[in-house]
Regions:
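Catalytic-core signal marking the mid-to-C-terminal active-site face
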Residues: 3, 10-23, 31, 36-43, ...
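N-terminal intrinsically disordered, cationic/polar leader segments
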Residues: 1-10, 15-17, 25-29, 35-42, ...
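A glycine-rich phosphate-binding loop feature that marks nucleotide/adenosyl-phosphate handling sites
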Residues: 40-46, 262-270, 307-315, 344-348, ...
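Short acidic (Asp/Glu) and glycine-rich catalytic loops that position anionic groups and cofactors
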Residues: 1-4, 46-51, 222, 268-272, ...
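Generic secondary-structure signature for well-ordered alpha-helical cores
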Residues: 22-33, 49-52, 70, 74, ...
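Helix-rich catalytic cores of soluble enzyme domains
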Residues: 107-336
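Metal-ion/cofactor- or nucleotide/acyl-coenzyme-handling active-site neighborhoods
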Residues: 314-328, 332, 345-373
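Short beta-alpha connecting loops at secondary-structure transitions
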Residues: 6-9, 273-280, 308-315, 342-354
């Protein structure tokens, strides 16, 4: 017999979420969203239940919204059904230098390769961790995918990937590489709160409609800036924007499936008015996650929380406290996928050593919540009776057989006493994490097949010479 799972209860109930859903449907039908793209407007205009008004405002009847929700598809990989998932990275431009502890630097190609290898060694998913700023801008996203395909089993290869494809030409190179490498390809559209889109982003999506690629919708309203000041009001706007955006995709992208991105599902960002900064890891952002999880269940969206985000600038006590509390409370609510591991300063910095510590924190929580058996065998009544008063269990057969599985043996959070720690060099947690990160990178072995690698090289060499690709990144 198993012990009952530990859980946190409370928060949004079904009646309250029904009300938010009704509000979102009303907003879709009576307020609408701005879609600044004539080609997409023309497609939408052909549907009954779509109303196009001046200024490219589009409104959707509730039945179209409900159909979009019904037809949404979430191709969660098999490993995500059994494992705790860590998504590591969101294309940062600054990182900590593993060879010079504490030194911040601009990310380069070598950092991209090393962090991809590190993430693969830790079984992480998600997008490329850093942007190689030593590479021309029009090649950066192509190289980020190429390196991920070549050196990682899961990175840029499942529903947890969320990288931009900044131009149609760039998207097509990545699409071609994904086919060669046998990797997943999808295109994402970001809504710009409140209720609008970037015209260029829509143009890329429009040109991809005949390619049969999955498309996802995401939005990130900011409380008090691009959405109401209350977090619950911001979440209400987020639900509206997600439902409207998904409906648009479901009507225009009929050659493949569409979905709400689990990476930012029902997002609502907290914003500090004193410093004008995003405050991931804050009390308010954790509050957002407590709204997000039940809404994901309500709409059947896979749960992925940003519990690994912190506003701390270094791998320090603040970072550990924010991430530890956020991870534990969301895990108690049922989350088993955690995003943004390795990020510091609310996403401004990437840190390989912090990724290693993030993994340890998640493993810590996982071991707290692992299923526990309640049985006569585990109560050990006979053992208690067999050991006389003042005796010891240390030499008992049961102790020898079970101590390794009864205790978690952490990689970083070691249980040494003071003397043992001093004999081991008195290293800080930061240094332990750096050493482990470098060791994992050195020992990493996965590489894509040679034949596929050669094809990827050819595609990348062609991209280097493509003037049209380069011009697509120019700002006139």
């Amino acid at each position: 017999m198993k012990l009952e799972d530990y859980k946190v209860t409370g928060g949004l109930n079904k009646e309250q979420m029904d009300k938010m859903h009704e509000n979102a449907l009303w907003l879709c039908e009576n307020v609408g969203i701005n879609i600044p793209h004539q080609g997409i407007i023309n497609i939408l205009s052909s549907y009954n239940g779509v109303k196009v008004e001046s200024g490219n405002y589009v409104k959707f009847k509730p039945e179209l919204v409900m159909n979009a929700l019904k037809e949404a598809k979430y191709d969660v990989p098999e490993y995500a059904k059994d494992e705790w998932i860590i998504s590591a990275g969101a294309h940062q431009t600054a990182c900590y230098d593993l060879d010079n502890p504490g030194r911040l630097k601009e990310a380069e190609e070598k950092d991209l390769i090393n962090f991809i290898k590190l993430g693969d060694a830790l079984d992480t998913v998600g997008s490329a961790p850093v942007v190689p700023l030593d590479i021309p801008a029009h090649l950066q996203h192509i190289l980020m995918h190429k390196v991920a395909y070549e050196n990682s089993r899961r990175r840029c290869n499942d529903i947890y990937e969320h990288m931009d494809k900044p131009s149609y030409e760039c998207a097509m190179y990545i699409h071609e590489m994904a086919k060669v490498a046998g990797k997943r390809f999808a295109f994402g559209i970001w809504m710009i709160s409140p209720r609008s889109f970037d015209a260029k982003n829509l143009e890329i999506a429009y040109k991809l409609l005949d390619k049969g690629v999955p498309m996802w919708i995401a939005t990130m309203p900011v409380a008090g800036v691009s959405s109401p000041i209350t977090m619950i009001g911001t979440i209400q706007q987020s639900v509206f924007e997600y439902l409207a955006g998904l409906t648009m995709l479901n009507l225009i992208n009929r050659k493949s499936f569409n979905y709400i991105s689990p990476n930012d599902a029902f997002e609502g960002d907290a914003f500090d008015m004193k410093y004008s900064t995003f405050i991931y890891g804050s009390v308010e952002y954790t509050e957002h996650t407590l709204y997000q999880i039940p809404l994901c269940r309500y709409y059947n969206v896979p749960i992925m929380t940003k519990a690994a985000l912190t506003n701390s600038k270094q791998p320090d006590g603040q970072a550990a406290a924010e991430i530890g509390m956020h991870t534990l409370i969301t895990a108690l609510m049922g989350a088993r996928a955690f995003r943004c591991a390795g990020l510091l300063s609310s996403g401004e910095i990437y840190s390989g050593e912090w990724l290693v510590i993030n993994k340890e924190i998640v493993d810590y929580v996982k071991n707290i919540l692992k299923p526990q058996e309640f049985s006569e065998e585990r109560l050990f009544i006979d053992e208690i009776a067999a050991v006389k008063a003042g005796g010891s269990f240390i030499g008992r057969k049961s102790t020898m057989q079970l101590f390794r599985q009864e205790y978690w043996m952490p990689e970083l959070f070691t249980h040494m006493n003071l003397g043992q720690w001093q004999e081991a060099g008195s290293k800080s947690m930061w240094q332990y994490a750096i050493d482990r990160a470098k060791k994992l990178i050195t020992r990493h072995t996965y590489q894509i097949d040679d034949d596929k690698k050669k094809e990827l090289d050819k595609i990348y060499e062609a991209a280097k010479k493509d003037k049209k690709l380069e011009d697509s990144f120019r700002i006139y």
